[in-house]
From Swiss-Prot:
The chain crosses the membrane at residues 25-45, 48-68, 85-105, 112-132. It is a multi-pass membrane protein. It is found in: Membrane. Pfam families: MARVEL. This is Proteolipid protein 2. GO terms for cellular component: endoplasmic reticulum; endoplasmic reticulum membrane; membrane; plasma membrane. PANTHER family: MARVEL-CONTAINING POTENTIAL LIPID RAFT-ASSOCIATED PROTEIN (PTHR22776), PROTEOLIPID PROTEIN 2 (PTHR22776:SF4). InterPro entries: Marvel, MARVEL-CKLF_proteins. It comes from Homo sapiens. The gene is PLP2. Keywords: Glycoprotein, Membrane, Transmembrane, Transmembrane helix. GO terms for molecular function: chemokine binding; monoatomic ion transmembrane transporter activity. Residues 19-137 form the MARVEL domain. May play a role in cell differentiation in the intestinal epithelium.
Length: 152
């Protein structure tokens, strides 16, 4: 039994890491890292703004795990493309508002860095929302069932 577990572990690891190499996987990983850096900057200057980074980092990590483990196909009652689209759209809007407020206040250096990184996060989340917009995704059409020569 231990041999079968050892043999299946690399296959499972490969299946889980394959998502990390896709465009969506790279975007989610970048969102997690950027939210962590913004969280550190906000914690050093104004802890009141850090809740946005914490929430978005947790949500991005949840979506990363859901897509990485292919749970979105196993939980069909949630519309994952629309959920992901609204998550990224709301994050982009909230990061834009928060960054503008932080940059207008003109605090210490870590606060300014957090504001600039928040604007970068706005662009990243906005691009992710554009990429995941469900209407943009190609729809599959049914293959013709009639023979090429016509019905017989």
């Amino acid at each position: 039994m231990a041999d079968s577990e050892r043999l299946s572990a690399p296959g499972c690891w490969a299946a889980c890491t394959n998502f990390s190499r896709t465009r969506k996987g790279i975007l989610l990983f970048a969102e997690i890292i950027l939210c962590l850096v913004i969280l550190i900057c906000f914690s050093a200057s104004t802890p009141g703004y850090s809740s946005l980074s914490v929430i978005e980092m947790i949500l991005a990590a949840i979506f990363f795990v859901v897509y990485m483990c292919d749970l979105h196909t196993k939980i069909p009652f949630i519309n994952w493309p629309w959920s992901d689209f609204f998550r990224t759209l709301i994050a982009a809007i909230l990061y834009l508002i928060t960054s503008i407020v932080v940059l207008v206040e003109r605090g210490n250096h870590s606060k300014i860095v957090a504001g600039v990184l928040g604007l970068i996060a706005t662009c990243l989340f906005g691009y992710d929302a554009y990429v995941t917009f469900p209407v943009r995704q190609p729809r599959h059409t049914a293959a013709p069932t009639d023979p090429a020569d016509g019905p017989v």
